[in-house]
Amino acid sequence: NSYKNKKILITGAGGSIGKELCIQILHLQPKQIILIDNSEYSLYLTNLVLDTLKKSHSYKTNIISLLKSINNSDTMKDTFTRYKPEIVFHAAAYKHVSLVETNPIESIKNNVFGSLNVIKAALYSNVKQFILISTDKAVRPSNVMGATKRLSEIILQSYVSNKIDIEYNIVRFGNVIGSRASVIPLFNYQIKQ
């Protein structure tokens, strides 16, 4: 168990993928999980689930919930400096294709520049492992969301490819059943209509 007694930071902790990562990682009993999300309600729900699991399993993991935006580079740098995570899961992103298409500037700010802020903060604080959660839409992107995620992958690769003291991974998910960006609820809605 390479996560036991480690400090792990998860961006997008209130999202469907981020929340599930938090749950699974808690079962590995890290020393600390630092949750970052810009949605108060989503962060609250994730924290509630983790607190319940922590009590029911008598885990000693320290859970820190931070209502923060990845779009503020100073905030990210300060957060990483203060909590000194060893492992980072970067799951924060705007992912609803139709909304990203109609709000490309905000999506680029969040998915590209926000990712850059997280990557730079991680390198500044000497993170040992960085996992970027991406999408299958980053392969030959045909929409803004796919392009922003592909750019975040390229940025990560360019910043860490020549570093020997950090392990990095990019995980591309397809359509995740049960996630808030899944096409399944849309299909169900259309069938009911």
Can you name each region flagged by the protein language model?
Residues N1-E86:
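N-terminal Rossmann/SDR dinucleotide-binding element
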Residues S98-N103, N143-V144:
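Conserved catalytic-core motifs of eukaryotic protein kinase domains, centered on the activation segment
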Residues S65, S107, F130, Y168-V171:
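Hydrophobic/aromatic anchor residues within beta-strands of the central parallel beta-sheet
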